[in-house]
Design a protein with these regions (language model features):
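Short, ordered, surface-exposed loop/turn motifs in non-cytosolic proteins
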Residues: 75-86
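Structural motif
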Residues: 69-75
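Bacterial N-terminal signal peptides
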Residues: 45-57
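Bacterial N-terminal signal peptides that target proteins for export
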Residues: 30-47
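Non-catalytic cap/lid and distal C-terminal segments of serine-dependent acyl enzymes
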Residues: 87-575
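Boundary at the C-terminal end of the N-terminal hydrophobic targeting segment
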Residues: 60-61
Length: 575
């Protein structure tokens, strides 16, 4: 009773001392009433006092941050306010430039969040770091010295892009947590727009030197889609880059095979440009054949579109195949026939090109997906979504489902990744992105969640919808007779046998399905490779990309000869 009373008293406004005084007054009155009481009553009362004192010392202090809008914006702003806190040790470098979440180590940085509406310049908002936080309420953080930074995610894109243009950030403040939150966090800096023509920081120095030379052959795509614009009620554009070969201008009568590629989750228009420069340089140096490469950005505020005609994201497949491709074939000297329309992509981009090949088999001549997202939902990142009482957080034995691994060891659990995603924002994260593509639309206009974010329990009705519409293996089983003529032999899939996100499991199931249908299959499992080192062949970090390019060219130009390059990995034995 006393601990409950104490909790209710200390939740008064800061500076209100009536609660503690009233509390200790009650303790004293209880002690006085105990005088002269029977021994058992005195013991009972003293135990109650001891329990109350224990409660007062055990309860952690509430952590509230004060965040103000400085000179970063002359007008009021809204968005998702995020506060990041990372523990600092004696060996950590000072000063700390920025505090961000770690994509793999979910517990490396604590995050608290809340929505902010119409915050005016000079105004201050309080963020209670115990209400919406990961991995724990801030009052339960391990006591220590922390680097803290506030970010206002104005377009709610942090789950996908991290901090980006237009977001407002504070300086990094060092403080002791939990408890020491007296220092004001001021949103003083606006992140500027990034130049998509400038290389990202992780681009090799040798490739950066190529940018100026390649510029003339890399052309921006900014195509307003009628179909997507009708769906959203506002102009929506497909963006990307067309890479013409270095010899394009010198051969005005020549047509070229065309490769359509897209990025994985987290990719952007800017990262696609880096890929465009790399492809141009490979053609310039003779390491890859002369083809037109079209990089189409599939990122959106909700995640990746996967070029699916989705009830939530809109008709992205239609926009690409019926609108953009015909427009590009009018502008550039492309083959404009199935054998000259080829597809490749990695991870979520791999799933997208696999889907496009299966859905539009007459339009495209072949797809080379690498490490595609799950194509058979009986193995969705290792989890059978169709199993009775399926749960994405816990296995039947109660142990956590892993999301990522390295050398057989779990790097991050699905539950941790999902819970953090919810704190950072409502959409744009990986699991929310899957739902915006695959799920039915709910009564409130948002996708119906595939699983309960609190318990991890899978919704069988939602999974039934996923199976009916987007399980590639299931679609092949149902429609192979009508697909066989235009699709057979066109899928060339490569994945590491130790894929970081367990995507090799789904690939094995898809291959087994296709073999069971009598389809010609080309599945390759690179022994020991994960998600991020799959393309390395010998000393060449992009060797697999070049090998795939020559395979595509051989399909488009039968009889052509490729230079001596390392052969793509052979198919692994069936398991």
């Amino acid at each position: 009773m006393f601990s409950i009373t104490y909790v209710s008293l200390v939740k008064r406004a800061p500076g209100d001392r009536r609660g503690p005084r009233r509390f200790w007054s009650k303790i004293m009155k209880l002690a006085i009433r105990s005088a002269g009481a029977p021994p058992w009553r005195r013991v009972h009362n003293l135990l109650a006092v001891a329990a109350t004192v224990f409660a007062t010392t055990a309860l952690p202090a509430q952590v509230v941050f004060h965040v103000s809008l400085g000179q970063a914006s002359p007008t009021s702003v809204s968005g998702r306010l995020l506060v990041f806190a990372k523990p600092l040790g004696p060996a950590d470098k000072r000063p700390v430039a920025a505090v961000n979440m770690d994509q793999i180590d979910t517990h490396a940085t604590a995050i608290a969040a809340q929505e902010v509406a119409h915050l005016k310049p000079g105004a201050t908002v309080e963020l209670d770091a115990d209400v919406t936080a990961f991995p724990t309420p801030f009052s339960h953080l391990k006591p220590g010295h922390y680097a803290v930074q506030a970010v206002l995610d104005r377009d709610h894109s942090y789950n996908y892009t991290g901090r980006g243009p237009g977001d407002l950030v504070s300086g990094v403040v060092e403080m002791d947590l939990p408890g020491d939150t007296a220092q004001l966090l001021t949103l003083a800096t606006a992140i500027p727009e990034a130049d998509p023509l400038q290389p990202l920081s992780n681009v090799p120095a040798a490739l950066k030197e190529v940018y100026a030379t390649a510029k003339a052959d890399i052309h921006p795509i900014d195509f307003t889609s009628p179909a997507l614009s009708r769906f959203w009620g506002r102009p929506v554009a497909l963006r990307g880059w067309v890479v013409t070969p270095p010899d394009y201008a010198a051969h005005p009568g020549q047509r070229y095979p065309t490769v359509y590629y897209t990025q994985g989750f987290g990719g952007s228009l800017r990262s696609l440009h880096d890929v465009a420069v790399a492809r141009w340089d490979e053609m310039k140096t003779g390491k890859a054949p002369s083809m037109i490469w079209v990089g189409v950005d599939q990122s959106s505020p909700t995640g990746t579109s996967e070029f699916v005609n989705s009830v939530n994201n809109g008709p992205w497949g239609q926009a690409l195949t019926a609108e953009l491709i015909p427009d590009l074939e009018r502008q550039y000297r492309m083959d404009a026939k199935p054998s000259g329309r080829l597809l490749t992509g990695h991870s979520s981009g791999g799933w997208a090109v696999l889907w496009l090949q299966v859905t539009y088999p007459k339009l495209f001549g072949g797809a080379w997906p690498t490490s595609p997202d799950p194509s058979d939902f009986r193995d969705f990142l290792g989890i059978n979504l169709y199993a009775p009482n399926a749960n994405v957080y816990r296995k039947p034995d109660g142990t956590p489902w892993p999301l990522a691994r390295d050398k057989g060891e779990m790097l991050v659990a699905v539950e941790d990744y999902s819970r953090r995603e919810v704190v950072v924002g409502e959409y744009g994260g990986q699991y929310a992105s899957f739902e915006w593509v695959f799920s039915p639309r709910g009564a409130g206009g948002l996708p119906v969640p595939m699983f309960d974010r609190t318990t991890g329990t899978v919704d069988p009705a939602v999974i039934a919808y996923w199976k009916e519409h987007y399980d590639v293996a299931e679609l092949l089983r149902r429609h192979w007779p009508e697909l066989k003529r235009d699709l057979d032999g066109k899928i060339h899939l490569t994945v590491g046998s130790a894929d970081t996100f367990y995507l090799d499991g789904s690939a094995h199931l898809l291959e087994a399905t296709m073999k069971g249908l009598g389809a010609r299959t080309d599945f390759r499992y690179v022994e020991g490779r994960g998600h991020f080192d799959l393309y390395t062949m010998g000393d060449d970090l992009w060797g697999l990309y070049k090998a795939i390019a020559w395979e595509m060219y051989a399909l488009a130009r039968p009889g052509s000869k490729s230079p001596p390059v390392s052969a793509p990995p052979p198919p692994a034995p069936a398991r």
